[in-house]
């Protein structure tokens, strides 16, 4: 896999206000690096749909990233709006990615079905919502790590099969 640029977004209103310490973002940065991506930025945004959607669009359209990973905001709480923001930003869903992540979580928690994370593409960028805690990030990441290089290689090709590096 040629170099893949990635952005990691931690989604948490409290962390965006400077309350507490982000443990999930660094765990997701480490995952991205393990799968061969170069993380160009890790930012924190509050649980606000328009802000999340705007950052997803920015990193896909102008930030030069082939991979955007989010952590947080995927549960059932009223302020968990990451899936809605992601659906608004993507062109196509990649449901198998989110399904594999949920299936992996099933082995570790009886609350796996409460995750609403989605994955999809915007142009040539893959966007994936991860859960909001380090152990779940590890479990979900292990479920999809082997498929990410192929997915990213497919997105890098044009209709004639040529790479866009």
What are these model-predicted stretches?
Residues 1-165:
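Non-catalytic beta/alpha edge segments that cap or flank active sites
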């Amino acid at each position: 896999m040629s170099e893949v640029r990635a952005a990691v977004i931690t989604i948490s209103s409290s962390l965006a206000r400077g309350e507490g310490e982000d443990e999930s973002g660094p765990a997701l940065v480490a995952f991205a690096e393990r799968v061969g991506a170069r993380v160009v930025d890790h930012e924190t945004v509050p649980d606000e749909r328009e802000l999340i959607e705007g950052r997803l669009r920015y990193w896909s359209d102008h930030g030069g990233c082939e991979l955007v990973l989010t952590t947080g905001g995927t549960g059932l709480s009223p302020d968990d709006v990451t899936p809605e923001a992601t659906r608004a930003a993507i062109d196509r869903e990649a449901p198998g990615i989110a399904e594999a992540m949920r299936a992996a979580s099933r082995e570790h928690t009886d609350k796996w079905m409460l995750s609403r994370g989605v994955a999809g593409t915007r142009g040539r960028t893959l966007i994936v919502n991860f859960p909001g805690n380090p152990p779940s990030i590890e479990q979900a990441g292990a479920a999809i790590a082997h498929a990410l290089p192929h997915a990213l290689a497919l997105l890098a090709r044009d209709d004639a099969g040529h790479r866009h590096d």
